[in-house]
Amino acid sequence: MTNHIAGGGNPPGPEGDASAGIDVVLVTGLSGAGRGTAAKVLEDLGWYVADNLPPQLITRMVDFGLAAGSRITQLAVVMDVRSRGFTGDLDSVRNELATRNITPRVVFMEASDDMLVRRYEQNRRSHPLQGGHTLAEGIAAERKMLEPVRATADLIIDTSTLSVRGLRENIERAFGGDAAAITSVTVESFGFKYGLPMDADMVMDVRFLPNPHWVDELRPLTGQHQAVSDYVLGRPGASEFLQTYHELLSLVVEGYRREGKRYMTVAIGCTGGKHRSVAIAEALVGLLRSNSRLSVRVLHRDLGRE
């Protein structure tokens, strides 16, 4: 049964043959309808994506994925109509994969003629089937050629009124699995005297907290030691700050998820990156890990530099 998505509908497509050891998705459809964007989303979700592989190479790639020790368990291949034998090529791939007990899912991307014309005119590109004809004629020829493919597709996505974000959400619901639910967050402590982290999405300065450096028994220790952590987190306002900042980050992470961003680096800085920033980073990681939708790691950039 074909699933048809227009605008913000709910996918999800049929399940692939998990017993075969590799899941295969063939992304096809009308030129300009968003095949490349769909492929990029699949890549972000951890799929191995190949663009316009010849049919015989698709089956070889699958064989490689089935081989012992291969890390390719999800393969997405973008197929277009550069070859006049495209429909036969797709049937050939399906038949070859069937001999390996694999039933690929076919995603068909489409859009209205008006929207396709607008996209081509905005990008000032010619249609692959246009030749010496008009753009509208090229689109019509492709639509007719792909009618048999569309009729047997597992998932049809109409991008006429879909934003990039909307397309991403539909692809994630259909093919994301656990990967679509996980955002990777790195909490990085650092010392301002060594410079700001270049890869930070957010930077927080915790130099407003008293510095354990001026406590003789704490000076040789780091924020990873319990005594330093207790000292830093026990200062007035420290626990309130930590809780409030955690709530703020939770809102930001959800915003990142809605925008399709799956990676985030939060930098926590103090003077030398040894005491306060380390203690706060460790405590923040503990709070963030309570969210099962996050994959959280901690990095202490400047620890040990003194």
From Swiss-Prot:
Keywords noted in UniProt: ATP-binding, GTP-binding, Nucleotide-binding
Residues reported in the UniProt entry to bind ATP: G29, L30, S31, G32, A33, G34, R35, G36
Annotated GTP binding sites: D80, V81, R82, S83
A Pfam entry, by short name: RapZ-like_N
Molecular-function annotations in GO: ATP binding; GTP binding
GTP-binding found in the keyword field: yes
Superkingdom to which the source organism belongs: Bacteria
Transmembrane segments: none
Stored InterPro entries: P-loop_NTPase, RapZ-like, RapZ-like_N, RapZ_C
Function in brief: Displays ATPase and GTPase activities.
PANTHER family documented for this protein: RNASE ADAPTER PROTEIN RAPZ
NCBIfam families: PRK05416.1
Family statement drawn from the similarity comment of this UniProt entry: Belongs to the RapZ-like family.
Protein name according to UniProt: Nucleotide-binding protein MMAR_2228
Organism name: Mycobacterium marinum (strain ATCC BAA-535 / M)
